[in-house]
A protein has these predicted regions:
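Extracellular, disulfide-bonded carbohydrate-recognition/adhesion ectodomains
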Residues: 1-143
Length: 143
């Protein structure tokens, strides 16, 4: 996040080039792919973190931004939700995980060993398009 953009009580008033603004936050959708740990480190290096989704409006906005992304058509974007312990989900900023404010695809989250990271999937019906996956190479959303 650029220091030349003033932060007010309503959040950021502008966003760095290549970032998208929504309700006082700035978001970066990557076109390159990294594993989850590298993705979080990349976001941190830009003064942000993997996105923490706090509302249905934010979830729908991000899903629409993914669908509008042109060539190459990226499918899966990491968010800042991960398994801390088996069956226990944790946001990167320690926001409490709330199952009623989660947007899982039908049949998700699956109880599969090693599927400890969460992505938003491009082609799933809105707003429920989260999927837990192995923490391999995917795109990312920084906030």
């Amino acid at each position: 996040i650029s220091l030349s953009c003033p932060c007010t009580d309503r959040g950021w008033t502008c966003c760095p080039k290549g970032w998208r603004r929504f309700q006082g936050s700035c978001y970066f959708l990557s076109l390159d792919r990294m594993n989850w740990t590298e993705s979080e480190q990349n976001c941190t290096g830009m003064g942000s973190q993997l996105v923490v989704i706090n509302s249905k409006a934010e979830q729908v906005f991000l899903s629409e931004q993914i669908r509008q992304t042109k060539e190459p058509k990226p499918d899966n974007f990491y968010i800042g939700l991960f398994v801390e312990k088996v069956g226990q989900w944790q946001w990167v900023d320690k926001t409490p995980y709330n199952v009623t404010a989660a947007f899982w695809r039908k049949g998700e989250p699956s109880v599969v060993p090693d599927e400890n990271c969460v992505i938003i999937h491009r082609d799933t019906e809105l707003p429920n398009n989260w999927n837990n996956v192995r923490c391999l190479l995917h795109h990312r959303i920084c906030e």
